[in-house]
């Protein structure tokens, strides 16, 4: 299917977002007397559904291309062009005997589906950071969206990946919900199709440009400005940005934790005792608890190394969906997330009452007090004016040794655990993020399970992780 080139959202023009977001849905085949037929039917259903989705939304089957600029220190333009008649679907048989390194459904269940058993190199069609994993094919076209169906003993793992310059997790989930509809023979509402295919220019409103806005924006803008060394000023912008976000491979490690519904309710109740806002959410409380706990685990190392001193700030970067702050429908399948920052001294971070910190987090996302809409309009305005889009990044001032960045997918659980894609497998028993190269200080709260459980995957250097796992307060609340 041929289509004219499709533009990306302006905030998707940043080169460092040339990565993939992965979600793996784990389906059980236990007690299925027709398992072989079900496996084949599942693959056929997904293949037909992807073709149907592309007929409604042609760009979903496209590829992202980069048009370099001839001007120095200019990152060029990224856009979507025609590629296939449907997004790629890979089917891999990973059952015992075919690939001994693949987990079985029994093993996954026994260990509560840990990230460490779900290797992106095995179960995902594209790795998170292209070229960062040994063996990754750099010459492969950059797909907008792709799916891999993995056959394992006792189940099926379906991994969906979305290219992050095109869509954030909320946008990717909307694409998956539309795929779920067509796989089940349902129609996608016309309004959702029109919204998906709308021109991206102008989605984010312009700034008003008054003095009050400028003052509010100054600190947030500084957090997202990459400081390019003078020696690098004449290098290619995209190459410099790629080097800037190169992951820390060692000695950082990933680990999985879980918080039961009962534990989360008790943690929130404890936070409410010291909260300055009675509107704090479970997500606010859990994110604040994670920030405090990790900072506490790092504190002895940081103080011993005098980096930082007790008065130097530690920062929590919290990814936020900006749609509702800009009056953009939640069903918009593009890229509209931003980040808010919370900085305190090392001593303040570990000693502050949990409820006070959770209340601070609430103020930044409460629509009545939040400035996320303003921050996002300012981000778009800066990017429109900046020749080198790589000079603006949410992680520009991120120090992985003492800061953390958290993306919460917990609120997507209701949607994720309700999607069966017409495969005849029922709903997933678990939804996870596959493991990828270590990036110290990065974490995700996973989609909330129907039983109330929320999982956490976090990457820390080994010595900090061991301290965290042994921390009495941490162990009290985690599974």
How does the language model describe each region?
Residues 17-32, 74-103, 247-254, 315, ...:
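Acyl/amide activation-and-transfer machinery of modular secondary-metabolite enzymes
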Residues 136-139, 246-247, 394-396:
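Short Gly/Pro-enriched turn/cap motifs at secondary-structure boundaries
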Residues 171, 248-251, 255-263, 277-285, ...:
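Short, contiguous, pocket-lining structural segments
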Residues 276-347:
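Hydrophobic, mid-to-C-terminal alpha-helical segments
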Residues 2-6, 66-90, 193-269, 314-320, ...:
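Short amphipathic alpha-helices and their capping loops
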Residues 1-212, 269, 280-302, 405-479:
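Non-catalytic N-terminal regions of enzymes
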Residues 24-29, 146-150, 255, 260, ...:
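Adenylate-forming
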């Amino acid at each position: 299917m041929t289509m004219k080139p499709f533009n990306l959202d302006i905030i998707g023009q940043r080169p460092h977002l040339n990565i993939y977001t992965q979600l793996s849905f784990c389906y059980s085949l236990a007690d299925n007397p027709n398992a072989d037929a079900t496996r084949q039917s599942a693959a056929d259903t997904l293949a037909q559904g992807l073709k149907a989705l592309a007929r409604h939304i042609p760009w979903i089957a496209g590829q992202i291309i980069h048009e370099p600029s001839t001007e120095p220190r200019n990152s060029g333009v990224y856009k979507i062009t025609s590629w296939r008649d449907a997004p790629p679907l890979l089917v891999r048989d990973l059952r015992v005997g075919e690939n001994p390194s693949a987990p079985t459904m029994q093993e996954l269940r026994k260990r509560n589906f840990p990230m460490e058993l779900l290797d992106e190199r095995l179960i995902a069609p594209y790795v998170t950071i292209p070229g960062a994993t040994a063996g990754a094919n750099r010459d492969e076209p950059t797909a907008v969206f792709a799916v891999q169906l993995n056959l394992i003993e006792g189940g099926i793992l379906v991994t969906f990946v979305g290219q992050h310059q095109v869509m954030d997790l909320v946008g990717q989930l909307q694409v998956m919900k539309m795929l779920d509809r067509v796989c089940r023979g349902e129609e996608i509402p016309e309004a959702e199709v029109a919204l998906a295919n709308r021109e991206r220019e102008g989605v984010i409103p312009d700034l008003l440009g008054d003095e009050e806005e400028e003052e509010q924006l100054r600190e947030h803008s500084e957090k997202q400005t990459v400081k390019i060394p003078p020696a690098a000023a004449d290098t290619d912008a995209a190459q410099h940005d790629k080097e800037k976000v190169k992951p820390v491979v060692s000695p950082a490690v990933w680990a999985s934790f879980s918080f039961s519904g009962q534990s989360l309710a008790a943690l929130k109740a404890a936070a409410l005792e010291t909260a300055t806002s009675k509107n704090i959410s479970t997500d606010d409380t859990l994110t604040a608890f994670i920030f405090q706990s990790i900072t506490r685990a790092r504190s002895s190392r940081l103080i011993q190394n005098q980096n930082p001193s007790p008065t130097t700030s530690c920062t929590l970067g919290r990814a936020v969906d900006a749609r509702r702050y800009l009056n953009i429908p939640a069903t918009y399948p593009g890229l509209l997330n931003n980040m808010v920052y919370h900085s305190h001294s090392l001593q303040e971070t570990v000693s502050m009452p949990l409820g006070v910190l959770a209340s601070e987090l609430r103020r930044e996302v409460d629509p009545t007090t939040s400035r996320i809409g303003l921050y996002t309009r300012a981000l778009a305005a800066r990017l429109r004016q900046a020749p080198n889009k790589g000079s603006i990044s949410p992680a520009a001032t991120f120090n992985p040794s003492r800061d953390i960045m958290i993306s919460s997918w917990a609120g997507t659980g209701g949607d994720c655990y309700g999607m069966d894609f017409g495969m005849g497998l029922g709903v997933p028993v678990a939804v996870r993020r596959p493991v990828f190269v270590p990036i110290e200080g990065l974490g995700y709260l996973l989609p909330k399970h129907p039983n109330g459980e929320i999982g956490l995957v976090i990457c820390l250097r080994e010595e900090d992780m061991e301290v965290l796992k042994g921390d009495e307060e941490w162990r009290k609340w985690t599974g």
